[in-house]
Amino acid sequence: MNHARSFSLIHFAAASLASIGALALPAGAAHADDAPSPCAALKRIVAAAPSGFAQLAPEDGRGVAQPYGDDASCSATHASYQCTWTPHGDAGSSAAALQAVAADIAACLPDATHDVNSPPRQHFYLGERAQRTQITATTAGANKLKLVVSGK
């Protein structure tokens, strides 16, 4: 078999396998990179702090909760933005889910200082004291989590 012919057969086989793989996935199948990322939502909320949070909509914060719960309820005032949600059953305890949220905050906002790390409360801040943005994640009762972002 000559080189050109074996090259064509290899390409045909690869294309066939790729086609079969594409057909095997349902049309609406989720991919790993389709999972909601809390980073965009966290960054959007924190970026609003200097001018006030009232410009944010309830939907703006739901991305923070989506990896962990489906019932996020978010609201904004001029001074703060908050979301409350119920963690999925597979998240384990509220304290375990809170630790996961704190890990996301730390990963998404590497300039944030993590100054409180306890089972019921995680606290971060960004900026100098006079212009500080506070990020607090807490357990809210037996099966709820609450995230509050506030600014000066």
List each language-model region with its residue ranges.
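Long, charged/polar, surface-exposed segments that mediate recognition or autoinhibition
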Residues: 69-121
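Bacterial N-terminal signal peptides that target proteins for export
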Residues: 2-17
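Short, low-complexity, Pro/Ser/Thr/Gly-rich segments in the mature regions of secreted, periplasmic
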Residues: 140-152
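N-terminal leader/targeting segments
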Residues: 2-4, 26-79, 94-98
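Short, exposed beta-strand-loop hairpins at the edges of beta-sheets
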Residues: 125-142
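C-terminal segment of classical bacterial N-terminal signal peptides
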Residues: 17-29
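Generic detector of solvent-exposed, compositionally biased contiguous segments
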Residues: 55-66, 115-129
